[in-house]
């Protein structure tokens, strides 16, 4: 995908380029050896990592100069996660940033002492038993998580406003990590008087079966696309299928309508990664991770793709358009 190729170039410029340009000397080597070491564990390398590194730079942490960033990417190989998490522990990282439930669960199993900053859209850290409270997480874990019930309610609301006769909705979700999010969507749909149809996926091969099922169930009038790294990767395929099936869609990924989906309402992922860098800064400056509260994103964007709306034969109400943060013509 274009975004991933671009972000890889940016990542190399920010990290690899900085390290390559730094003169090799005993003094520089000594500085690097004494530099704070940040571990970063996530499924894919993308533009969000660039936002994280840029914010580190703003805070005075120059990767390859006075800071070491140890990045581990596990892609679809979940079985590699324990080894990758243990690598970061053995490298004596001062803090580990773990993006996605897979990543921070592996990190928590690997260490109970190194501070972990989690970034996740699919989980409830209290209900999952990872922390005791949002205000005082305790242990070695903190981070950024969504208020799923409120967000899922808004997604149903915006989809229903776009399709006033909406009464049956398909839910495309990752059944490995998305159960909490799916239950929150069920609750929101019940409150809105909408019947849900589950369209679970676990791997890339499941998407066609989910699409076929949605097409066969003629009652479905729209689809809520829940979040997971896998679903984000497949956003263009999902958007293309939805237009062919003439099904309005909404996702919490703002990249989704830019790939051809109808609607998105969700947090700015680059902002979340920038905020993770602020957590890292506070930890490296001596704050106890147990005293750093779990935080919710404060910025949410509504994005509407009018080109897709026209292809679906929909007229988006003016009341919704005026609330949009971005309209794609």
Per-region residue spans from a language model:
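Short hydrophobic alpha-helices and adjacent helix-cap/hinge residues
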Residues: 1-329
